[in-house]
């Protein structure tokens, strides 16, 4: 086979990859048909409820791309810091979950983690409760604000584009156990926010999500010192 033919085959493979929809890419990432079916149900519920209330700006293929797949890429980065076994049977709370990203995809794929949600918007809570029931996810949902929450202390905490880093630190210190870890999904402004932080009780590590090419997305890993 000539080098030119090799090049043509490579070009064809790259074209096939580019032609895949984001839902097809997700199906390959997940591989488990039952879990992928739940993701499809979740996406359908988001699209249905988005017509009633302001859940998210994501729709169509972008819902798969920026909602589902980005959630998985973030969890892949998180798994570079700990083994999956470290999360099993531990408590993980997501603050301000809104339409359910990243917590619902996480809960679908990793059912052995005890997931919780803190969400202050009552309409979004009703949506999340419906998703929880329809998909049998067993997430515990609290309709309150993080600053008012005092019922439990968690092993892990996450939030996606919810608040300034300074406020996330306050939430982290209030609702987590002493040896807890925070994973906060942020955009490029995280570096400006870090410059404004002067808290010697917290260590912060910024992890770039390399698989997200179109924009800069980071997981901010947080621990007590």
From Swiss-Prot:
One of its GO terms (cellular component) is cytosol. This is Ribosomal RNA small subunit methyltransferase G. It comes from the Bacteria. It is an enzyme of class 2 (transferase). GO terms for molecular function: rRNA (guanine-N7-)-methyltransferase activity. CDD domains: AdoMet_MTases. Specifically methylates the N7 position of a guanine in 16S rRNA. InterPro entries: rRNA_ssu_MeTfrase_G (IPR003682), SAM-dependent_MTases_sf (IPR029063). Keywords: Cytoplasm, Methyltransferase, rRNA processing, S-adenosyl-L-methionine, Transferase. Its EC number is 2.1.1.-. It comes from Mycoplasma mobile (strain ATCC 43663 / 163K / NCTC 11711) (Mesomycoplasma mobile). Belongs to the methyltransferase superfamily. RNA methyltransferase RsmG family. It is found in: Cytoplasm. Its main location: cytoplasm. S-adenosyl-L-methionine binds at residues 96, 101, 146-147, 160.
């Amino acid at each position: 086979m000539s080098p030119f033919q090799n090049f043509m085959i490579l070009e064809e493979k790259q074209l096939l990859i580019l032609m895949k929809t984001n839902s097809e890419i997700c199906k390959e990432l997940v591989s488990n048909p039952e879990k992928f079916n739940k993701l499809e149900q979740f996406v359908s519920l988001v699209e249905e409820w988005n017509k009633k209330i302001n859940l998210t700006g994501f729709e169509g293929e972008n819902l798969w791309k920026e909602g589902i797949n980005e959630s998985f890429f973030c969890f892949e980065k998180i798994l570079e810091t700990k083994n999956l076994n470290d999360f099993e049977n531990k408590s993980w709370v997501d603050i301000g979950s809104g339409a359910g990203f990243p917590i619902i995809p996480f809960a679908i794929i990793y059912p052995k983690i005890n997931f919780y949600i803190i969400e202050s918007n009552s309409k979004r809570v009703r949506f999340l409760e419906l998703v929880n029931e329809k998909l049998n996810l067993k997430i515990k949902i609290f309709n309150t604000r993080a600053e008012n929450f005092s019922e439990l202390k968690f092993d892990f905490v996450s939030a996606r584009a919810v608040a300034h880093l300074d406020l996330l630190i306050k939430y982290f210190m209030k609702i987590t156990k002493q040896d807890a870890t925070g994973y906060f999904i942020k955009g490029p402004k995280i570096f400006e926010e870090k410059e404004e932080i002067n808290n010697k009780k917290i260590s912060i590590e910024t992890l770039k999500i390399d698989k997200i090419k179109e924009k800069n997305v980071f997981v901010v890993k947080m621990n007590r010192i």
